[in-house]
């Protein structure tokens, strides 16, 4: 009994000695943006949500420069009413110019911080961080909510492939596949997603334009929602819009690490919602024609994208992982060389229904 009493006393004493942080005494960063400055310095801009009476909120912005991410955060804290903490960080923005000068160091520093979560969104921009975060974009949402909602809904319901802090770091540590991140551009008082950046290790090697994101997502991610417009042959104003897209791609590798051959089979199921040419879509033959046209366009665009990946020596699909899993006596060094001359074939199978078609 005495031992239990002693244990309880010691527990209370230790809890009392633990370092505690009262929420009202700290400023919780929700968005961090990083840029480069002269002489190789790093500039960080941090958005903090501050709440007034009645639940009304406002965003405070703090910026500082330094040699490392830790120094930048510490210097920015000197300008705020309380120390800046990263426990509510939701979005991290990197300027394009910083990628070759320390992006990985910043990510590793954040990864070692136990208060930083895994589901943080990452993005690339060509805009200065301070300019981006100080924009007046939405009357209903602060910048943190606006940015995270923009990324989340496009990944869940649009053509933006899914990625986050955890996934990006895993791809850097594992040679199974190369990474990609969304790109954000600023046009007046509007932020918009403007394609994705492709990486080789921690270096950006290429960009994919928004018009190619549908097929890129088919190759790298499973579709569970989304809308896409196909331009059909013939008249310049002939289009078909599909939505409620369900899609996946099955990959099969033959041969070995020295002479690999990859089959990519894309399966798409969707509903036609709009068609700008008079056709009898009650006729199964017309539906079959549309499916074939769409399938051929997907095959063509997917083939072009994969050739680009090979030319840039980046593997966002994860074919290295496929080879390691399915090919006996896999040799990573042989693969690095053979990837430059990879042979592959893309096939696409499209199935559509005519739910609520308008012409």
From Swiss-Prot:
InterPro entries: Spore_GerAC-like, Spore_GerAC-like_C, Spore_GerAC_C_sf
Record's GO cellular component terms: membrane
Residue numbers with lipid attached (N-palmitoyl cysteine): 17
Keyword Signal assigned: yes
Keyword Transcription carried by entry: no
Cleaved signal peptide residues: 1-16
Principal location class: membrane
Family (UniProt): Belongs to the GerABKC lipoprotein family.
Purpose of the protein: Required for the germination response to inosine. Has no role in L-alanine germination.
Protein name: Spore germination protein GerQC
Organism annotation: Bacillus cereus
Gene of this entry: gerQC
